[in-house]
A protein has these predicted regions:
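Short beta-strand to alpha-helix junction loop
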Residues: 182-191, 234-254
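Rossmann-like flavin
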Residues: 112-222
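Residues forming anionic-ligand binding surfaces in small-molecule and nucleic-acid pockets
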Residues: 222-233
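Extreme N-terminal leader/targeting segments of oxidoreductases
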Residues: 2-24, 42-43
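A conserved short coil-to-beta-strand element within the FAD-binding core of flavoproteins
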Residues: 265-278
Length: 319
């Protein structure tokens, strides 16, 4: 069984709005904005997406130079079953729109002492065997011990942070196993401090450091929960998108439009409009005002709350 098929979002949320005749505004044609627009449009809502840039996909972009394609942001896809689920529920199978293939081997590491480590895709046993071959039995045993911790982190964080919306702080701390879960995630520990405690081989430590550095973070301060990334890659595999990762954004934008969503490019949103604490629409950079009782912001939280919403307090979930 393909391990990626084991992934299935547990939460299928239906947007709560007054009427489906109301127009929904989505800020940003990144992957999250496009996914929201697709599901909303498929459910019968009128959807308009405003994207500041000239193309869809957000950080998932590909440029072509002299016949070669280069990904300018992420280059690998993990958990493709998330997209399979989205495409299946909004029309055609993902495979009918895009070629997604496992990267094999997943990674090739070369170290200054001449050591080479080649890691397979979607194989926990194969990964341990490769580490043992290159670094020895002790390193392999330490890696497996670390991945057991990462597996627990993934089990704890997957549902509340990945598959569900994060409501209030109260809803988070009221979880039955909150204290045990906090100990597992160890938010007070950095990635490097946890890894250095579990791993003795400096090459393996360097390998794990890169899960912080490739996102522009410092492993000395990045949270230990980043260990879930190598775990997910090891278990669910690393995948290549035919034509480059930007192709994923293109086909998702097409899917959103096929479902009825309208997308306007080169059209930044300058402000989310509110009245009496309720959203009334958005103001575009060109001065246009688009009225809407429902706005989905795919911008990061700092931009959304720090600029687009002005000085309004952070939203609370109302039942």
């Amino acid at each position: 069984m393909d391990p990626t098929l084991a992934w299935k979002p547990r939460l299928e949320r239906q947007a709560v709005m007054s009427k489906k005749s109301d127009e929904v505004v989505v800020i940003g044609a990144g992957m999250g904005g496009l996914a929201a627009a697709t599901r909303l449009a498929k459910s019968g809502f009128k959807v308009r997406v405003f994207e500041a840039g000239p193309q869809p996909g957000g950080k998932c972009r590909t440029i072509n130079i002299d016949g070669y394609s280069f990904d300018t942001g992420p280059s690998l896809l993990t958990l493709p079953a998330v997209y399979r689920d989205l495409f299946l529920k909004s029309g055609k199978h993902l495979g009918q729109e895009l070629k997604v293939t496992p990267v094999e081997p997943a990674f090739d590491y070369f170290f200054s002492d001449g050591t080479r480590l080649t890691l397979p895709s979607s194989s926990r046993a194969g990964t341990a065997a490769a580490i043992e071959k290159s670094f020895g039995h002790r390193a392999a045993a330490e890696w497996e011990n670390l991945m057991k911790r990462a597996e627990k982190m993934w089990a704890v964080s997957r549902e509340p942070f990945v598959e569900s919306e994060l409501g209030t702080l109260t809803s988070l701390i009221s979880r039955p196993r909150i204290f045990a879960d906090l100990f597992t995630i160890a938010p007070w520990r950095s990635l490097r401090s946890l890894v250095n405690k579990k791993i003795s081989d400096p090459r393996l430590r360097t390998l794990i450091d890169r899960y912080a550095t490739y996102t522009g973070s410092d492993p000395r301060s990045a949270p230990a929960v980043l260990l879930t990334i190598p775990y997910v890659e090891m278990v669910f595999g690393a995948w290549h998108v035919g034509g480059g990762i930007g192709k994923l954004g293109e086909v998702l934008a097409e899917r959103a439009q096929n479902c009825g969503a309208q997308i306007e490019y080169n059209c930044p949103v300058s402000e989310i409009l509110t009245s009496d604490g309720k959203v009334t629409g958005v103001r575009l950079a060109d001065g246009r005002v688009i009225e809407s009782q429902t706005v989905v912001s795919n911008a990061d939280s700092e931009l959304t709350y720090g600029k687009l919403l002005g000085n309004l307090p952070v939203a609370r979930k109302e039942k």
